[in-house]
Amino acid sequence: MLTTTFARKREESVPLRKGIQRALLGLSCLVLSTTSFAAGGEWRTHGYDDAGTRYSPLAQITPDNAKELGLVWSYDLESSRGVEATPIVVDGVMYVTAPWSVVHALDVRSGKRLWTYDPEVPREKGKNACCDVVNRGVAVHEGKVFVGSLDGRLVAIDARTGKRVWERNTLIDDDKPYTITGAPRVIKGKVVIGNGGAEFGVRGYITAYDPTAASRPGVVPGPGDPSLPFEDASMEAAAKTWDPAGQVLGSGRRRHGVELDGLYRKAGFCCTSAPATPSPWSHRKRSPAGGDNLYTASIVALRPDTGEYVWHYQQTPADNWDYTSTQDLILADIELGGKPRKVILHAPKNGFFFVIDRTDGKFISAQNFVPVNWATGYDENGRPIENPEGAWPGHLSMRFPAPSARTNWHSMSYSPQTGLAYFPAQNIPLVLQEDKNWSYNQAQPGQAMAGIGWNLGMLVNPRPPASQPFGRLIAWDPVQQKEVWRKEHVSPWNGGTLVTAGNVVFQGTADARLLAFDARDGKELWSAPMGTGVIAAPVTYEVDGKQYVSIAVGWGGVYGNFTRASERRTPGTVYTFALGGKAEMPAFTEYQLNNLVSGVDYNPDDVAEGTGLYVTNCVFCHGVPGVDKGGGIPNLGYSTAETIAHLDQFVFKGPFMPRGMPDFTGKLTPEQVEKIKAFILGTADAVRPKK
């Protein structure tokens, strides 16, 4: 049994076990098997190769001929929510996932459907997904396709027939709001999967399974027994970085999210981009006496056979701002100081680009790639030099970057030819302030999304942000730690990147385009319209001697749920291009443009209380009425008068529950719904242009 957990005396163990283990939940642990190394003509694993570079050796498409790219085929994913999947291409078949963890198998030559598999995720589980009902893809191994379902199952599907071979519930507690949105990885004969849910206060871990029989070799960390000693030294060391006084909050414990995204490369261990979000976000709330709170916001290396801890590097000690480390890790061999070094390249949400020695986890360098104000840099020991003006409690904090900003989950690529990393960067403005009234799972008006289980310990935007949003593509030199070129986009929330040996970088954008750039200087080479905004990354592969580029498109994700940069809202689609492609683009559909809601009576005295209720239950899905435009989910300020007049019919066992809308029966009263209506209508009146 593969277990790396912490167990110690009961009076100390329970909070830490459920806290630090949770830290491993947000763990972006991308684990890749050397046996699944992608042949040049295929895209067999999530990051293309066992180093996660998203660099293809295909070179048929070049800066000179990229303008000749044309559509070859498109495929309708029959979905209306966010599409974050990286397609996998093996033996002439593309496997791609849609929202709600639905798997599609396509003939890569024609784009025709071979089969689909729907794990039939109960739609009430949608409320447990902080950031949309997305899925980032599958793993393919020895005739099976593996997918993690949103409700926490790992499913093995026959790659030829699309029939389920086996499934396993990966959750250690079915009563907790866990989700899986990440792609599984296959490493050394094991299927490995992580999970998410940090905002909801769930405990993180990674599980490994035998792909042939669905047996589970182990859990990291394992559930453990609080009456026993710590199970290894790493958990005992982590326990010392948490304040026991802050570990039990109300009826709950400190929580941390994890999502699988580590890398294995003949080094004997898996490098795990680890624990994402500590919960609550407020460090003072979860650990009043301080402490670094290992292993949150860290890169952790584990033995792939046993899950044994090897080393860690914490990028944001005592994380106060949701600076997850779940972004892509890339393994590279570069020359530093005249010597070859085996390194990890990483650009997480805290706004710094890191170069870490992957053999021992030692810090090499870090440099901010966008403006930051939470820290002025990193010292020689790899600790951030923090800005004391951000100290809590009470301060309004206009943090740069904000929690959704600088980078997010969107994929990075690295070219050994140019020596550059290519990644989307952004600013999504946010103001945070410690919430003095916060208690675990005790939702109060004004606490963002606490009504559906979020535990932030922070007030979100107690006053409007001052900075402006932006989105850009950055080409970064990890040796010199400097930007080489950038491309400004019209909005944040752009897709991940692909780079090829032909010196071409591909990226999709929030304003519904697929772009090609010269990898050397950033010159735009080609553009194709997409049916809606793009958040996923493209892939490339070769069929019958011809290079193709494919991308799965569908607007959504947490930011894309409530706003948009394109007026197109075509259902989720896979688009495939090649030189000389002559197929016609499918017809695009557009958002229906409605006027601000009016003509419904409300009591202006209810607006203030309705504001807090709306923030607590609605804001991160529907946005601010009449201010945000609406994205994957409609903005209620542009609803019809009939909809708002009968809002209770949508809130209580409403018609959109089959699409994932929560049922607020027993959580809101009819009187509270009236006050939410007043806020929607009052805000619409406030922003309506004066005649």
Curated annotation (Swiss-Prot):
By its UniProt entry, which Pfam families does this protein fall under? Answer: Cytochrome_CBB3, PQQ
Q: Which InterPro entries does the protein's record reference?
A: Cyt_c-like_dom (IPR009056), Cyt_c-like_dom_sf (IPR036909), PQQ_b-propeller_rpt (IPR018391), PQQ_MeOH/EtOH_DH (IPR017512), PQQ_rpt_dom (IPR002372), Quinoprotein_ADH-like_sf (IPR011047)
Task: Please provide, alphabetically and separated by semicolons, the GO molecular function terms listed in this UniProt record.
Answer: calcium ion binding; electron transfer activity; heme binding; oxidoreductase activity, acting on CH-OH group of donors
> Which reaction is the catalytic activity of this chain?
butan-1-ol + 2 Fe(III)-[cytochrome c] = butanal + 2 Fe(II)-[cytochrome c] + 2 H(+)
Q: How does activity depend on pH?
A: Optimum pH is 8.
Q: Where does Ca(2+) bind?
A: E199, D322
Could you say which residues bind pyrroloquinoline quinone here?
A: E84, R136, T181, G197, A198, K349, N408, W409, V558
Q: Which cofactor does it need?
A: pyrroloquinoline quinone; Ca(2+); heme c
Q: How is its activity regulated?
A: Dehydrogenase activity is increased by ammonium ions.
Subcellular localization(s) per the UniProt record: Periplasm
- What does UniProt list as catalytic? D322
- Temperature profile: Optimum temperature is 60 degrees Celsius.
The Cytochrome c domain sits at 605-684
- Top EC category: oxidoreductase
Q: Which Gene3D superfamilies match?
A: Cytochrome c-like domain (1.10.760.10), Quinoprotein alcohol dehydrogenase-like superfamily (2.140.10.10)
Q: Where does heme c bind?
A: C618, C621, H622, M661
Q: Where is the signal peptide?
A: 1-38
Q: Keywords in UniProt for this one?
A: Calcium, Disulfide bond, Heme, Iron, Metal-binding, Oxidoreductase, Periplasm, PQQ, Signal
The family line of this record is: Belongs to the bacterial PQQ dehydrogenase family.
Job of this protein: Involved in the metabolism of butane. Could be important in the detoxification of 1-butanol. Catalyzes the oxidation of 1-butanol to butyraldehyde. Also able to use 1-propanol, 2-pentanol, propionaldehyde and butyraldehyde as substrates.
Q: How does it assemble?
A: Monomer.
Q: What is this protein called?
A: 1-butanol dehydrogenase (cytochrome c)
Q: Which organism is it from?
A: Thauera butanivorans (strain ATCC 43655 / DSM 2080 / JCM 20651 / CCUG 51053 / NBRC 103042 / IAM 12574 / Bu B1211) (Pseudomonas butanovora)
